[in-house]
Amino acid sequence: MRQIAFYGKGGIGKSTTCQNTVAGMAELGQRIMIVGCDPKADSTRLMLHCKAQTTVLHLAAERGSVEDVELEEVVLTGYRGVRCVESGGPEPGVGCAGRGIITAINFLEENGAYEDLDFVCYDVLGDVVCGGFAMPIREGKAQEIYIVCSGEMMAMYAANNIARGVLKYAYSGGVRLGGLICNSRKVDREIELIEALAEKLNTKMLHFIPRDNVVQHAELRRMTVIEYSPDCNQADEYRALAKKIINNTDLRIPTPISMDELEQLLIEFGVLDDDQKIAHLIGKTEKELAPV
């Protein structure tokens, strides 16, 4: 069994990419479980055609303990037999959502939820912002990390940060970076830019997903593109990505770069203006722009 995780900047399309890719993998006969590691509990809605499934933490809070929760109450079967679980999280402003991930994964392991699977896919909230959200990496649960990004500055910044998290636990836990998945935002020279970032991070751009309105049309119906419009070009893009992940053996220890190197890359591709141009635009000298 392979355990993989999808990380990336909040709002980049991780859950959509994860579920559509898993649908493609299931089409190819893979036995898969999605574990949603996000308090929003939206990691399985396209597979189950529902708003949000009941989470492990919600049921544990209702019952008083996670030991009082039954596996079949939180593991639901979705599109093409994909098993779906949501870890959930506490009420806003109370407690640690990262603890929900830890509790849920331990519960699943202890109750034999991972038996007879080819893949477990963790869909993890946003950046590596705290130890709890890094838990699938830190505890050696996820062995392959796929970073969903785009040619936008903050998406690339997040990708570099996530690479730092992978590097931190690469030697102790054996986790590796499987590649970058570019979920296009139609940024100029986006493919070249992500390929350049991938090279600097000692990885590759595994796949470029073009922007297509059919993704939103499918989501409005709580379906993956592969189920909603199986013959469209976008469905084939997700199938291609699914095959690449299944066949991927090129797993590497990343080499994250400094903020200065990242900014220089963005300047080189015209995403950011250099200090001279910014100084000219705001009527200051480069010296005045320098950090104190």
Curated annotation (Swiss-Prot):
BP-aspect Gene Ontology terms: nitrogen fixation
EC number: 1.18.6.1
Requisite cofactors: [4Fe-4S] cluster
ADP-ribosylarginine sites (modified residues): R99
Amino-acid positions noted as binding [4Fe-4S] cluster in the UniProt annotation, renumbered to this chain: C96, C130
Keyword Transcription in record: no
Pfam family, one: Fer4_NifH
The record's free-text note on cofactor binding: Binds 1 [4Fe-4S] cluster per dimer.
Free-text function comment from the UniProt entry: The key enzymatic reactions in nitrogen fixation are catalyzed by the nitrogenase complex, which has 2 components: the iron protein and the molybdenum-iron protein.
GO MF entry, a single one: nitrogenase activity
Residue numbers binding ATP: G8, K9, G10, G11, I12, G13, K14, S15
Family: Belongs to the NifH/BchL/ChlL family.
Keywords: 4Fe-4S, ADP-ribosylation, ATP-binding, Iron, Iron-sulfur, Metal-binding, Nitrogen fixation, Nucleotide-binding, Oxidoreductase
PTM summary: The reversible ADP-ribosylation of Arg-99 inactivates the nitrogenase reductase and regulates nitrogenase activity.
Designated name of the protein: Nitrogenase iron protein
Subunit structure: Homodimer.
InterPro entries the record matches: NifH/chlL_CS, NifH/frxC, Nitrogenase_Fe_NifH, P-loop_NTPase
Entry-linked SUPFAM superfamilies: P-loop containing nucleoside triphosphate hydrolases
Enzyme class: oxidoreductase
Reactions this protein catalyses: N2 + 8 reduced [2Fe-2S]-[ferredoxin] + 16 ATP + 16 H2O = H2 + 8 oxidized [2Fe-2S]-[ferredoxin] + 2 NH4(+) + 16 ADP + 16 phosphate + 6 H(+)
Gene3D superfamilies the UniProt entry points to: P-loop containing nucleotide triphosphate hydrolases
